[in-house]
Each structure stands twice: as structure tokens, then as C-alpha cells.
Amino acid sequence: MQDWTIEDSAELYQIHGWGEPYFKINDKGHVAVMPRGEGNGEIDLFHLVQDIQKRGLNMPMLIRFSDILADRIARLNACFVEAIREYDYPGIYKGVYPVKVNQQRHVVEEVVEFGRPFQYGLEAGSKPELLIALATLKTPGALIICNGYKDSEYIETALLAQRLGHTPFVVIERFHELTLLIEAAQKLGIRPLIGVRAKLTARGIGRWGDSTGDRAKFGLSAGEIMEVVAQLKAADLLSSLQLLHFHIGSQISAINVIKTALREASCVYVELAQMGAPMQYCDVGGGLAIDYDGSKTNFRASKNYNMQEYAYDVVAAFQDACRTKNVPVPTLVSESGRAITSHQSVLVFDVMGVSHLQFGEPEPPARNEHSIIRNLYETYTQITPDNVQEAFNDASQFKEEALSLFALGYLGLGERARAERLYWGCCEKILNLVRELDYIPDELADLEKNMASTYYCNFSVFQSAPDSWAIDQLFPIMPIHRLDEEPKARGTLADLTCDSDGKIDQFIDLRDVKGVLELHPVRPEEPYYLGMFLNGAYQEILGDMHNLFGDTNTVHIHLASDEPGEQSYRLEHVVKGDTMTEVLKYVQYDHEAMLESIRRETEQALRERRITLSESRLLLQHYERSLSGYTYLTNELQVELAAR
């Protein structure tokens, strides 16, 4: 039998698929990050985590790689430049970043900075996001796409922003907004830049398939678009209608769905131009997917196309439609937020403990033990590769009989415990044999998951990976070290919350979703770190404070190519995670009042001799220190490592 290699780990965790071109396994068996792509410098993630801990930041931590964000923006623009060249398209591409995908200030500021050479703009879906866009975007010629529900204040703010040199397009998504826009334009004496969102009949795919169609939340029907044109003509504002927008949903995994929508949208664009609107832009919305599982298929966690193919199809659709009708082609706009921000963030957390189902060789039953126990032991001894299905059926039947006998009072608690241990011992033996079979019977398919260990991890699913809980989103998860060792354990992940939903028990697989993750045994006095990858889109802003676990520590890393060696990076920003005082304040608790309440209670206990002076001092020290401390657990091993 060959020794385990890092290539075995790479294949197991599919890092060559979902990680391309930013993540790999290095010769040390650690995950390496290549923020600028293969061959342009790399960072050992395990060493980086150790370095950050030495600076006093504890687990869990979110690490953002600024260079990945810059590279994603550059790649997207390069793909459209190539598509425009390939099709001899007489127009340009101007992307916008949807602020809702990740509204964190450092992220938005970096998007604007890295997008400046490409006139990369911002998309706002609400009034607060519009305020962010106006305060952050200073790039001449960059677009601000104003989406979402709008009131008069929203629209007037967007119109007045033109006086500052911005290019804000107010996109009509509900017919009612047209009246507000016309009134605001007349009131302020500002000719607006107007877009309309079309409600396409082409359906999306997956969870967000209802973003289009007759019952879609946003957008105008064909009849409503005709009425918009008529009313704009009547108000002498048809010359302001310059942009068509559509959106068929997020994470579109199948390219044929995108092609169908593009054909329909390009026809709408041409018709608007022929109706007299001086159309100049088409915003194709989002949908550019991420390959979370590395399978390169149309599975919901993957995609069957690449970024270049996507750009080719967008350009080709409008080139063909406009040529056919002799209409000038539009400047192309996309809102590819997930594709831009997903790769840049890695959540790293440590394992706090493990619960195993391991039983070993059972002792033979005594002659006077109940027949159920003897039957279970006999089943255990007779398990072979040829009878695993029969043995499992027998063991399951005997276990059910044991539970019935216990409920009727014919079996004691100790005997029930013995029967359960024998049953799980049978399952363990069967599972070890099943793993070697070419074909696994359906009834035994769940055995791996049922026998899996539980790895208790220092993070909150609800705070750091809410989509995993809410919509069964799959994220690549793997150890960030020890990848030159075979991971012989099978486990699921449990978070710190007191909630049975606080777990991850679905993991990426090349052909399907698997119920367990291959992991290593946790060694005493040695940390075990796991990484959750591709979670830079939506997770931070959607995360909630279930059980009052707050934001994690966050660091921004920038590759410093002129500094060779393991320290070839800079910590650009450090954002400390929430303290207990901060999360308590969110739910209207005053930490001073809480501390004073404990002090009074302690003094009362001292007077009544229910607590000693040293105990009261220790309690108050713990209480006060906790108020200023991190909401997550502090592993004593973390403290020791940070001090080294």
C-alpha cells in the first residue's frame, strides 16, 4: 500500500477544481494561497495563521486576501476585453460591483481602488447602499446603478449626485417609481439618467430561478415597458432612457440558461432603441457563478462554463441582435458580485474537541445475560463482507426489540446500554467492510454519516456561514495543514451555538454531496485548523448573532512580492471581532449596569457568608474581563502559541 501524498489530499478535497488558480497544497502539506494566481507568489496559510495569533488575535478569524479581489476584477475585465476583440464589438464593458454582496467598508473601498483602471462602478439596492456608493466612488466615468425599491428621497439623492459628477442611473423596477422620478426631475430641474428593468420570461435555474418570470419580485412586463416609454415621451424625458437592466438570478450554473436570457434581453434592447429611446447601456445583472465543488458541471454548487465563455456569450448576443436591426451596440454592464468577492475570504477556525463512536471488540456475554444481548453478540461475530446487508438488518431488528423490552420493563438500563453498544459495534464492523466494497447497498449508504465523529469547532454557522444553514449552500472545507497525512477519521462539524441546526453535515464531492468530511485525529496539545473557502459573498452581512456570537476577527493580507520568504505579506488592516460588551449593547444591555448588578449581588452574598472574599474577587474579575473579551472560546493552547 502506497504512502499518502499531498496529491491524494488535493484529489480528496478537490482543491485543483474549486481552488484554481488561488489555492493549492504545498510541499509541507499546508494550504498555500496564491493571491495573484499560479506562479506569482504564495503564502503558507498555516504559517500565516500562526503569525496572526502571535499578534494577539484568536480564533476564529476571517482572512481577506486583497490581491485576490484585485485579480478577480482584472480577470473579469480582461475576459470582456478579449470577447470584444474576438467579436470585433464596437462597444466597451463597464462593470459594477453590487454593494449588497459584501458591504464591509474595507471591501468596498478596495473594489473601488482596484477597479479604477477599468472605470468599475457600484450598484446600490437601497438608500444606505446609495449613500455608500456616493461617498466611496470617485472614479470618473464609473457608473452607479440605482436598483431596489425607491422613494422620493432616494430618487432625488440620485439625481442631485449628477451635480457632483457622478453617473447614477435610476432603474425603474416598479411602475410606480416612474411617477416619482418624473416629479423629482421636474422639481429639481435635472434631467435624469433612466434605466428600466425587464421582467424576462426566460427562467433562471436553481434557488434563484424565480428572479425572472411573470411572478418575479422586480421588473416590468412588456406592457409596462411600453407604458414607460409613452409616459417619458409625454414628459419630454424619453432621451433620458438609456439603459436596459435584467437579472435572472444568482449562481446560474448552466450556460444555456444565460444564453436564453441574453437572446430575449437583446431583443428588448433593440426594440427600445427602435421606439426612439437613445439606448446606450445594457446591464445584464448578476448570475456569473462560482464553482464551489470543483466539478465544472451544472450542479447547483458548480457551473458548466468559465468566465471567458460567459463574456463571449454576453458580447455575441448583443452583437448579433444589434447588427440584425442596424442598432448601435450598448456599453455592456454586469453585476458580478459573487464572482468578484467569493475567493478573497477564508474563514479559519480551530477544533475544540471530538466525539467519537468507537467501540472496539465487545466482550462475550455471560450465559445468564438476556437472549437479545446474546443474539447481538452472535450477529457481531458472524459479520463478513458477504453478509453485511443481512447482518445490518439483524442487528437493527435486535436493537429495536431491546428498546421495546426496555420500555415494557423487561430489560434494565444496563442491559439496554449493553445492547446499544453491541448494535453500534456491529455498525462499526459493517462500515469498515463496506468501505472496501465496489457497490454499497442503499440501506447501508447512510452508515458512514451515522457513524461519523463530531468535531466541535470554534465558530458559529449562523454568524460565519449563514447560507450553509439557510439554503444548504456548499462551501469547500478542509484542514489547512497535515495534508501529507491520510485523514482516517470521518466527521461532521458542530459549532458553538446551543442549536441543533448549528452544524455542517453536507460537504462537496466530485459526483454528489457527501455527508461526512475526511479529517485527521486531533492530537493532544496540538491545534487542528480547518478552513472554509469561497465565503466572501453575502456571508458576512447575512450573519446573525445567534447565542450572541458576534463578528469574528478579520485581517486583510496583501502580498509583498519584494519581500521573499515566508513573511512575504503585509497585514493591511486588522478589524477586531465583537467583544461581549458590543454584542450585549446590540440587544440593549448596558455593561456598566450589568457589572453594578453583579457587584451588589456579590456584596449581598458576602454579608450572608455565601461566598468568600477571594471567590467574590475572582467572580468579578472573570465577569469584568469577559465583558471586554471575544465572544468566541479562547483555547488555552491558542494563548500558549501566541506567547511563543
UniProtKB/Swiss-Prot annotation:
Q: Which InterPro entries match?
A: Ala_racemase/Decarboxylase_C, Arg_decarb_HB, Arg_decarbox_C, Arg_decrbxlase, De-COase2_N, De-COase2_pyr-phos_BS, Orn/DAP/Arg_de-COase, PLP-binding_barrel
Q: Which cofactor does it need?
A: Mg(2+); pyridoxal 5'-phosphate
| EC code(s) of this entry | 4.1.1.19
Q: Which family would the database say this protein is a member of?
A: Belongs to the Orn/Lys/Arg decarboxylase class-II family. SpeA subfamily.
Record's signal peptide: none
List the GO molecular function terms. arginine decarboxylase activity; metal ion binding
Pfam families, sorted: Arg_decarb_HB, Arg_decarbox_C, Orn_Arg_deC_N
Which amino acids does the record list as binding substrate?
C282, D283, V284, G285, G286, G287, L288, A289, I290, D291, Y292
> What protein does this entry describe?
Biosynthetic arginine decarboxylase
The record describes the protein's role as: Catalyzes the biosynthesis of agmatine from arginine.
**GO biological process terms on file:** arginine catabolic process; spermidine biosynthetic process
